Amino acid sequence: MKLRDSLAENNSIRLQAEANTWQEAVKIGVDLLVAADVVEPRYYQAILDGVEQFGPYFVIAPGLAMPHGRPEEGVKKTGFSLVTLKKPLEFNHEDNDPVDILITMAAVDANTNQEVGIMQIVNLFEDEANFDRLRACRTAQEVLDLIDRTNAAA
């Protein structure tokens, strides 16, 4: 499942969302996937449990978090959601706080999780200007167009 197709088919983009805590921000992304029948509601708790155990493991770049759990933690099918925050939040990551872009990922198997999802997101942000371009997006279509332009350039 491609990042762009998943976001479009699942209607799983939320821009300029308001959250007061990192937990609320993660829940927004998971709730989009629950609504699209990609994950079960328990996926949210699995992500929180992962942070409790390993720290903010999914904050992968300055301003960018990629919340995800394991396939057996409530994943029904592979999919993504994308959330931008109106106000950046602290995720307690030493180097990459504050975060205002979250791409929540669910994958039915670990290989899909690592290879497909992470590579597509790396591709999107290889051009660092895309962080600010994404922050400037105000509609889901603008996000999809940005991904299309990035893929065309790759």
From Swiss-Prot:
For the modification Phosphohistidine, which residues carry it? Answer: H68
The induction text for this entry reads:
Induced by L-ascorbate. Repressed by UlaR.
Which PROSITE patterns does the record match to this protein? PTS_EIIA_TYPE_2, PTS_EIIA_TYPE_2_HIS
Q: Which UniProt keywords apply?
A: Cytoplasm, Kinase, Phosphoprotein, Phosphotransferase system, Transferase, Transport
Identify the InterPro entries for this entry: Ascorbate-PTS_EIIA_comp, PTrfase/Anion_transptr, PTS_EIIA_type-2_dom
Provide the GO MF annotations for this entry.
kinase activity
Catalytic center residues: H68
- Can you quote a single GO CC term? cytoplasm
Localization (cell): Cytoplasm
Q: Where is the PTS EIIA type-2 domain?
A: 6-150
Q: Mind listing the GO biological process terms from this record?
A: phosphoenolpyruvate-dependent sugar phosphotransferase system
Domain writeup? The PTS EIIA type-2 domain is phosphorylated by phospho-HPr on a histidyl residue. Then, it transfers the phosphoryl group to the PTS EIIB type-2 domain.
- Biological function: The phosphoenolpyruvate-dependent sugar phosphotransferase system (sugar PTS), a major carbohydrate active transport system, catalyzes the phosphorylation of incoming sugar substrates concomitantly with their translocation across the cell membrane. The enzyme II UlaABC PTS system is involved in ascorbate transport.
Q: What PANTHER family does its record include? A: ASCORBATE-SPECIFIC PTS SYSTEM EIIA COMPONENT
Record's protein name: Ascorbate-specific PTS system EIIA component
Q: Which organism's genome codes for this protein?
A: Salmonella paratyphi A (strain ATCC 9150 / SARB42)
Traced from the root, the source organism's taxonomic lineage reads:
Bacteria, Pseudomonadati, Pseudomonadota, Gammaproteobacteria, Enterobacterales
